[in-house]
Regions:
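Structured soluble/peripheral alpha/beta segments that form catalytic or ligand/cofactor-binding pockets
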Residues: 1-378
């Protein structure tokens, strides 16, 4: 549901998660070149991994432990994309929860502002895989989050204390307005609230979701009104529920805010009779996701595509990576130009009533490689 909760967007790596856990704040938005008008989708990620990892007798952390600032731009038909990853020791970070504040060197994050820079030389990308290209990026951006996705009990203090999910999610800004300037390899890009189609969220937990899936867009075109919708946004996020040491099948959260009205679907609920089915298929040039969701009040069919050429590979160290062995990495693909359609219906005693068909543009997608065989789950 569209409910802001700044406490859930705060720093939360305490207790066991401080020794084996991660937290990542994500922001993505569209900018336009001041010189040429070229459109480019940028992303920023602030990642903290295992801040209190156990130390060996020689004084070295036994698990990967660092702060990473990742900045870049997704590929497009005219641009090959770029990922810049800068690593810092945990001791270099400063943070507070209320209000949200995070900084490392000249990089700053709060609820209403992002600023910083990353400069990676070609020499720094050599040797062990860092997941970084060479280049420079600098940003100074105002942030105004207008639609949130609140997952209710599934990220509550009780569920967090029970470690009920491998990874928790809070979408404080599934529709976010950004304003500012990004300098990318010497070229200036302007970010405007009306054309940025921004997205901001946070993940934290003891392990990354497997499979990892995120889909989102706030650029939705209505067939009914023949215009782009204003107070509307889509967000889909996977989760891996568990009970004690037992893991269950991966599930999905889905929220569509349609002109201010929320249509929410999660894994089976006895009260809402909610269910979701997912199918994913990888073809030669694109990846396709198909989702059917229904509860007692509404139904939704989502089809979303992303061209593989417009996706960038992102790499993550797992929170349980043992540095005494080879470091295991999670590899995902991400893009900022996904497209598709949403068919939305209201369920009445007499059947389904069509509400609208929406066209999706400039969608965010982050995913692992889909299974070769379609395996829907509910």
């Amino acid at each position: 549901m569209n409910q802001s909760d700044l406490d859930r967007n705060a720093y939360m790596l305490c207790g066991p998660l401080a020794r084996k856990g991660y937290l990542r704040w994500w922001h993505s938005f569209v900018g336009h070149s001041i010189a040429t008008g070229e459109k480019r989708t940028f992303f920023l990620e602030y990642l903290i991994l295992n801040p209190l990892a156990k130390v060996s007798p020689k004084g070295r952390p036994q698990k990967a432990s660092y702060v990473r600032i990742m900045a870049g731009a997704f590929p497009s038909e005219t641009y090959e994309g770029m990922t810049l990853s800068a690593y810092y020791p945990i001791s270099a970070a400063k943070y507070a929860s209320k209000p949200l504040y995070f900084s490392v060197e000249d990089t700053y994050l709060s609820e209403n502002r992002l600023s910083g820079s990353v400069n990676i030389s070609s020499e720094e990308t050599e040797g062990e895989l860092t997941g970084s290209d060479a280049g420079t990026m600098e940003w100074d951006i105002e942030v105004h989050k207008t639609i949130a996705c609140h997952t209710g009990i599934f990220a509550s203090p009780l569920f967090c204390a029970l470690n009920a999910l491998d990874s928790f999610w809070h979408g404080e800004g599934i529709r976010t307005q950004y304003r500012g300037i990004v300098e990318c390899n010497g070229e200036s890009f302007e970010i405007q609230p009306e054309t940025c189609f921004g997205y901001a969220d946070k993940h934290w937990g003891s392990a990354y979701n497997s499979p990892w899936l995120q889909l989102a867009s706030c650029r939705l075109y209505s067939e009914r009104t023949d215009r782009f919708l204003k107070h509307s946004a889509l967000a889909v996020n996977g989760c891996c529920p568990r009970f004690l040491f037992f893991r269950f099948k991966p599930k999905l959260f889905l929220q569509l805010t349609y002109t201010g009205e929320d249509f929410c679907y999660s894994f089976p609920s006895p009260f809402q009779r909610s269910m979701i089915k997912l199918g994913a298929k990888e073809e030669r040039t694109r990846v396709t996701w198909q989702i059917k969701a229904q509860n007692k009040n509404s139904a939704l069919k989502l089809t979303m595509h992303s061209l593989k050429a417009n996706m960038k590979v992102l790499k993550y160290d797992n929170p349980d990576s043992d540095l005494r062995e080879s470091v295991s990495k999670r590899t995902v693909r991400a893009g900022g130009s996904a497209y598709g359609t949403i068919d939305l219906y209201r369920i009445t005693p007499t059947g389904k009533t069509w509400i609208d068909t929406l066209t999706i543009e400039d969608g965010l997608c982050i995913c692992q490689k889909p299974r070769t065989k379609r395996r829907p789950h509910t």
